[in-house]
């Protein structure tokens, strides 16, 4: 539990540090996340001194798990600190669907069964920092955002790689969408044309994402100038920044402003007209298309399940990941062979 307290504190600090870079909706989410984590840390501090005794009682297999862990410092009897994304995150939406964490109830409504014990992070960067700083945590990020600060585990024996996604061996993948409402401005359309051209698709491929059109034509700008506001998913943002850099290099009259938040906020902004192009790391919801949005898939991306670099776990089944995120599996001795 001490690990979890530290993780909550780290998450709260990271969420607070990112407030300045987000829009109003992002600010509210980050503040809420930071306040919640601070309160949770305060509440948990009183129980922290008893964490050793509590973790020792996790399962009847504690003795065997401890013996298996003698070869290293990783203690299998520790609780799993589950780290998830916020409501509204396209990555969370895709993750819970692909792993079966989201299920329909008797009324046919979709229910997110993510454990209430999950630590909530409000961006890809905070997720990476949280897992990299907590030896006993587990999380998930866009494959294109994966770096060596954490370790991606294989799912059912398949590594999270572009080639495995293309071959179908790694099935945890989703689309990156952009969305517009009505007829885009000339400069917004020019930027979209760049993204879907051979030039734009090459940028996508170069940044570890999967292009959707290998036969796209070379880009020819319409010469439009002006400002384009692009808002939404923190998973799509990194590759959108790369696309922006490449585009303005060939059309210096264009100004591209990227506002990072989450998929739902981006789609709402596109519907409201407060941005020109929305970003979503998932399929659009019926309510969003009914609200007048037109989606364009610009890339495919995998979702990598991540653990701390000091965690010896290298492979998990989809059922095990589901069990962890629904709270059925609570300690690493229920995972590590």
Model-based region annotation:
Residues 12-16:
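Alpha-helical transmembrane segments
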Residues 17-21:
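C-terminal motif of bacterial Sec signal peptides marking the signal peptidase cleavage site
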Residues 23-39, 43-337:
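Exported/periplasmic ABC-transporter solute-binding proteins
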Residues 1-5, 10:
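Positively charged n-region of N-terminal signal peptides that target proteins for export
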